[in-house]
Amino acid sequence: MERRYSTLKPLNVRNLEEYNVKVSLKDRMPVIVIIIDELADLMMSGNKKEVESAITRIAQKARAVGLHMILATQRPSVDVITGLIKANVPSRVAFTVASQVDSRTVLDTIGAEDLLGRGDMLYFPTGAMASTRIQ
C-alpha cells in the first residue's frame, strides 16, 4: 500500500484511476482484492490488537490506491468483528446467521437470522439507512 502511494506521489495524482490514465499501458497498476477468509482464526492466532490495527489501516487508506478488502467469518461475534473494524469497514454483507445477536453484530440490525440460505443475503452499503435483501 505504501509503495503504491510512493508511486502515485511524483505524478501528483490522488488515486489509482488518475494514475492509470497518466501512465503507459505497461506501467498501469491493477486493482487488488485482499480476501481474509476466516477473520476469527486470524484474530485468535496472534496479537489481536496488531491484526485489528492492520485491518483498520488498510480499510482507511487502501481504496485510493486500488486495494480492496473482503473480510469473512463463520463466527460473527464482537470478539472477531470489533467496533473499530466495524467503524472502518462500513459496507457489509450478511448471509444466514444463527441469531439476532449475530445479525446485529454484522449489520447493526436484525434480519440475517431469517434468510433462506443459497445466496440469500442482506447488503448494507456505505451511507445507507437500511439493508437491502439480494440474491
Regions found by a protein language model. Give the residues of each.
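P-loop NTPase motor-domain active sites and their immediate coupling elements
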Residues: 1-135
